[in-house]
Amino acid sequence: MSEALNELATYLTEVRGALISSSEIKYGELNVTTTAENVIALLTFLRDDAKCGFVNMTDICGVDWPQRPDRFDVVYHLLSPKKNLRIRIKVPVAEDQPVPSACGIYPGADWFERETWDMYGVLFTGHPDLRRILTDYGFEGHPLRKDFPTTGFVEVRYDDAAKRVVYEPVELKQEFRNFDFLSPWEGTDYVLPGDEKAKA
């Protein structure tokens, strides 16, 4: 498997090296980094080239790196059933930088791009129907961003008296607490209060 991935990495560098920023093999997959400007050309090549044959897009997802200037990685996961190989294409983009839609190449990218936009706020230009897919229509923000509050902004509940769903600001019943527990697999070198009762 790794020999086939090494051959593929070498082939891509020789034939389409101008489209690739970097590549490495990790966890049994070839990881290729490219730019938003080159992603469509690279995806088209990977699908159409006889030595590649990546005809199946299995997923598009996002990764949030708030400390980086290019805050998000848009990650495309492709499968070549004929070659039995997988490849991961990473596209680092800034918060306000759009990415061209891959729907024209892989029709299945439609919902994947909608999910990535809904969860992270990454904009896909040329998408036929870019709207929320997992959150409510009036939802504010993008919940998988690392700066999104864990509690959210609003609480949604059914009001039996009003006979409808109501949206209210989140009201925490207790102050925020940091639950920092020891791992049950690590244990301690000392006896915690109450442990002596458990051993008896």
Curated annotation (Swiss-Prot):
<dbReference type="InterPro" id="IPR020396">
    <property type="entry name" value="NADH_UbQ_OxRdtase_CS"/>
</dbReference>
<keyword id="KW-0874">Quinone</keyword>
<dbReference type="Pfam" id="PF00329">
    <property type="entry name" value="Complex1_30kDa"/>
</dbReference>
<dbReference type="GO" id="GO:0050136">
    <property type="term" value="F:NADH:ubiquinone reductase (non-electrogenic) activity"/>
</dbReference>
<protein>
    <recommendedName>
        <fullName>NADH-quinone oxidoreductase subunit C</fullName>
        <ecNumber>7.1.1.-</ecNumber>
    </recommendedName>
</protein>
<comment type="function">
    <text>NDH-1 shuttles electrons from NADH, via FMN and iron-sulfur (Fe-S) centers, to quinones in the respiratory chain. The immediate electron acceptor for the enzyme in this species is believed to be ubiquinone. Couples the redox reaction to proton translocation (for every two electrons transferred, four hydrogen ions are translocated across the cytoplasmic membrane), and thus conserves the redox energy in a proton gradient.</text>
</comment>
<comment type="subunit">
    <text>NDH-1 is composed of 14 different subunits. Subunits NuoB, C, D, E, F, and G constitute the peripheral sector of the complex.</text>
</comment>
<keyword id="KW-0830">Ubiquinone</keyword>
<dbReference type="GO" id="GO:0048038">
    <property type="term" value="F:quinone binding"/>
</dbReference>
<comment type="similarity">
    <text>Belongs to the complex I 30 kDa subunit family.</text>
</comment>
<keyword id="KW-1278">Translocase</keyword>
<dbReference type="GO" id="GO:0008137">
    <property type="term" value="F:NADH dehydrogenase (ubiquinone) activity"/>
</dbReference>
<keyword id="KW-0520">NAD</keyword>
<keyword id="KW-0472">Membrane</keyword>
<dbReference type="InterPro" id="IPR001268">
    <property type="entry name" value="NADH_UbQ_OxRdtase_30kDa_su"/>
</dbReference>
<keyword id="KW-0813">Transport</keyword>
<keyword id="KW-1003">Cell membrane</keyword>
<keyword id="KW-0997">Cell inner membrane</keyword>
<dbReference type="GO" id="GO:0005886">
    <property type="term" value="C:plasma membrane"/>
</dbReference>
<dbReference type="InterPro" id="IPR037232">
    <property type="entry name" value="NADH_quin_OxRdtase_su_C/D-like"/>
</dbReference>
<dbReference type="InterPro" id="IPR010218">
    <property type="entry name" value="NADH_DH_suC"/>
</dbReference>
